[in-house]
Regions:
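Ribokinase/PfkB-type carbohydrate-kinase core domain
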Residues: 1-103, 158
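Conserved post-catalytic alpha-helical subdomain immediately downstream of the catalytic base
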Residues: 108-159
Length: 159
């Protein structure tokens, strides 16, 4: 682990797949040790991993990570086991948009070509804007970007 790179980051973005290997668990544990210096975000990734990784998830959420993100089903599944797991929560609501804490933004109605990468686009764009814009505008721009990703065949917009 390159400590100086981690410490120079605005956010550390980790996910539930990280908890599927010993090295991944070590990386997550280390990241939580420096959470006072770098904001930590954690993605739930898949509902099946929530129960599978429950013991490690409990350790993570005792640390009150900065932003938890996932889709509605993942957030609901997690709440069956752990309540109030993060300081902030970003929820992807699919074609209905997204929610950040108490802020809801609806997505534009489109013909979806492929939703692959939309969740990653949502969190990536939101994090890119969150330090520069107020939360509602950052979320609005993130939903707009994720919507555009759904209009192409692939997870990235070509520039």
């Amino acid at each position: 682990i390159n400590i100086s790179e981690l410490l120079s980051s605005d956010f550390l973005v980790l996910d539930n797949f990280s908890l599927s290997s010993r090295k991944g668990i070590e990386t997550v544990e280390y990241s939580l040790q420096i959470k006072d210096e770098v904001r930590v975000c954690f993605g739930l990734s898949d509902t099946s991993l929530i129960q599978e990784n429950y013991e490690n998830l409990k350790k993570i959420f005792l640390n009150k990570i900065d932003i938890l993100f996932g889709n509605e089903a993942e957030i609901i599944k997690l709440q069956e086991f752990i309540s109030n797991p993060a300081m902030n929560t970003l929820v992807s609501k699919g074609s209905k948009g997204a929610k950040y804490n108490q802020i809801n933004i609806e997505a534009s109605k489109i013909d979806v070509v492929n939703s692959n990468g939309a969740g990653d686009a949502l969190i990536g764009a939101f994090l890119a804007y969150t330090d520069f814009l107020e939360d509602r505008l950052a979320l609005s721009k993130a939903v707009s970007y994720a919507t555009k990703v759904c209009m192409i065949n692939g997870p990235r917009l070509l520039t």
